[in-house]
């Protein structure tokens, strides 16, 4: 059985969602199709469609949020790669058993009507991986 075989979106950390939206609108030639806040994560997000691909921009709304800490340490740029999964609980169990460190023990409500779980970059070769399942 194939696992993690479809990229759901690519997440990019930005200091300013307005500036990021302007930049990526110029780059892709389209406006973001969605903007929303995820209060529990301390972020505002916007989503772009670039052909078959989705790009998520993330701006911190809380200085203690993971995005604020990421930008403080690394600056703006690629934050995570998200993979679509059909059963997030089963994938979390499979990946945990395979030695990957989950950053949350249960799926959390994320942006774009998804259940999400992140894998620690220490266990994925330095890349933050997000699992995404439609909340339906």
Predicted regions and their residues:
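Short glycine/proline-centered loop/turn elements that form peptide/ligand docking sites
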Residues: 19, 37-41
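Short strand-coil-strand connectors
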Residues: 15, 49-51
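N-terminal beta-strand motif that seeds the catalytic metal site of vicinal oxygen chelate
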Residues: 1-21, 76-85, 135
């Amino acid at each position: 059985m194939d696992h993690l075989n479809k990229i759901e979106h690519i997440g990019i950390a930005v200091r300013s969602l307005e500036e990021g939206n302007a930049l990526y609108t110029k780059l892709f030639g389209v406006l973001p199709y969605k903007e929303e806040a995820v209060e529990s994560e301390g972020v505002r997000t916007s989503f772009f469609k670039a052909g078959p691909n989705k790009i998520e921009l993330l701006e911190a709304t809380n200085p203690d949020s993971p995005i604020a800490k990421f930008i403080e340490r690394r600056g703006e740029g690629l934050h995570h790669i998200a993979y679509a999964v059909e059963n997030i609980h089963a994938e979390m169990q499979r990946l945990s058993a395979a030695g990957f460190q989950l950053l949350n023990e249960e799926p959390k409500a994320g942006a774009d009507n998804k259940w999400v779980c992140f894998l620690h970059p220490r266990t994925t070769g330095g890349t933050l991986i997000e699992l995404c399942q439609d909340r339906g």
